[in-house]
Amino acid sequence: MALPLLPGNSFNRNVGKEKFHKSQHWGFCNNVMMLVSDEKPGIGGEPLLGQKIKPKCSIYPKGDGSDVPSWVAFDKQVLSFDAYLEEEVLDKSQTNYRIRYYKIYFYPEDDTIQVNEPEVKNSGLLQGTSIRRHRITLPPPDEDQFYTVYHFNVGTEVVFYGRTFKIYDCDAFTRNFLRKIGVKVNPPVQCPEDPYMKIRREVVEHVEPLRPYESLDTLKQFLQYHGKILCFFCLWDDSVSMFGDRRELILHYFLCDDTIEIKELLPHSSGRDALKMFLRRSKLPKNCPPRVYQPGQITDRAVLNSYGDFIKNQADGYLFDRYKLGKVDQEFYKDSDLSLGVTINVWGRKVLLYDCDEFTKSYYKSKYGIENFTSVSCKPPSPPPKIERKFPPYNGFGSEEDSLRNCIDLKPTPHRRNFKKFMEKDSYGSKSNILRFFAKLVTDKCVDLDRMFVISYYLGDDTISVFEPIERNSGIAGGMFLKRSRVKKPGQEVFKSELSEYIKAEELYIGVTVNVNGYLFRLLNADEYTLNYMEQNTDKYPFSNLKLALQKLKQEEGKSRELKQVFKAADSKHTNMVDYNTFRDILMSLTVGNLAEQEFVTIARHYRVPEGTCSDMDFLIALAHEKFKKNMFENFDTFIYSCVYEDREKKNVLPTKDIKRLCKSSRLPLSDDLLESLLSRFEDSEKQIDYKSFFSALNWRKNPVPELQPASYLKERCEDVWLGMPSPIPAKYIDYWTFLKDAFGLEEE
């Protein structure tokens, strides 16, 4: 009996409810209004009175985790069952039924089922997917329901569309899955064997085929080792045979098909045909056959006969010899037969493997575990001592080379010049390849003491010419002193079997005395091209190597302080420069003959000051002295005192801008351009000036300079152009301070 609807007796069940939408029960199908589904819930998703909604998926017990949909929880999970089917056959002459094996796949995410039949070779049945994936209904009278996971178990039967499948086993994942959802899994059941396939297998085992085919699978080996080649260095010693010699070979073993090719290393000018292939690529038999096989004698299989007909759509055929009568068994070289020190038989030739490349070593180490890859020594035997050929002495007719050629060949031939050297050292463009030296005749005759010569050495053919510049009213004709020819070294016999030695280019350098056909010449200087050539080829001219010269000076490091004081005393203007003669005299007193004259020239050329800088500096200082003399300005000590006062750190240097400000404030009688030019000459890399050196150079009373000479309107001869009389000194001024830093590592105080 229901309670009356009085206050306190009725309960509102919709309190806290937020979902009140109505389900759509009607829709259109082919433009016809109809009831879409009768399984949709009522208002708010609650079922109607008496309505039972069938679940879309199997009902699994909920765990303690999050309640996720089945298509997420069981994604990529498949249950696999092994089943078989007994199928009746129409032709019962051999058997009454067939056993067909299937794989049943159940997808728990949506309860779909798929049935596949594994392929059996020569079964005569259509195999593959038997039932595609979808939900399968239960057999009548429950056709309104679908198969779920609880309908599957080992030892049970399932009916799909009238066909009964007997499940006899499942995989480990399926067995574990069923146990987790509470299903007791039965043990596996023995599956019956197909009687028809059993009969066929027994027949095949007792029948020998008339056309037996031998399966030879080489694809795997080809794909695994394609492009991988073993390389061995070999030697075929054929010196024991007549006109035989030693042959250097390279053996390539192709791992993809076990073939071998051999190439020959032909030495230069061997006289052999330019055919590098010694053995074409093929399989190499271990045992050399006694004779060459005839065509068709070596085949993979023997063919008994062939048959064919002109009937259309009928293929020709042939029969193999299954007993393999007359087959030649050959054993070929494999990679396991090749190793260092092994001698292989290459069609009757004994080839020694004495070395291999790095890939071959790594291959044998990884596959066979070989660690020792010591190469085999195969040096040729020492040749017999060569009999020295003796030639008759020079007879005095013609040149020594022509006389020697007459003794070598039966038919006299001219002497062959070194054409390669001639082409490389011949003059072309701005390169003359001629070394010119300024020399003086060494003699006791007073008349010849002042004679000067130009000695030219031609690098193309090692010839020498001597020229004497013509001077007027000297009493000497001058001109060509020695025509171009090769000059022999003194002290050699004239009539001898060996060729004479001649003066070489490496024996000429500044300071050396050369004997030219009995005349002694002392080399005083050289032109710019010669000095540059000698400095570029220090391996042939060690006296032109600056590093070697500085190493000799470093041996006198104990005199470095004294040497610095001597240079400072010689540099009265504090310009860190001295003239060449002063520089040479100071170094000569220090080394006491340890340095050659060529080394002095090399050092002077490296540390020389450009002539434009020196002349510009002297010109500016002379111009400033002239201004000071006109204005009678002598107050230089005041400038030095002011600079000392400004120099708080006592470094003897001040910034350029401070010295310029001091000069302008003290009314120094110099124009702005001249002052800027002088400051730039004394400025260092840090924009600072040694104020003592600067004002000492400007002091025209203590450090006077020659007065400016008026410009000459006569045309003067340029000293840089080679006129046969080179400059007696290599440089006018030398930067001695840079030299001291490089040679002894001295720093400025």
Swiss-Prot record:
Pfam families from the UniProt entry: DM10_dom (PF06565)
Domain DM10 stretches: 75-182, 226-368, 431-538
Keywords: Cell projection, Cilium, Cytoplasm, Cytoskeleton, Flagellum, Repeat
PROSITE patterns: DM10, EF_HAND_2
Annotated localization: Cytoplasm, Cytoskeleton, Cilium axoneme; Cytoplasm, Cytoskeleton, Flagellum axoneme
Major localization listed first in the record, in broad terms: cytoplasm
UniProt keyword Cytoplasm present: yes
Assembly mode: Microtubule inner protein component of sperm flagellar doublet microtubules.
Record's protein name: EF-hand domain-containing family member C2
Species annotation: Homo sapiens (Human)
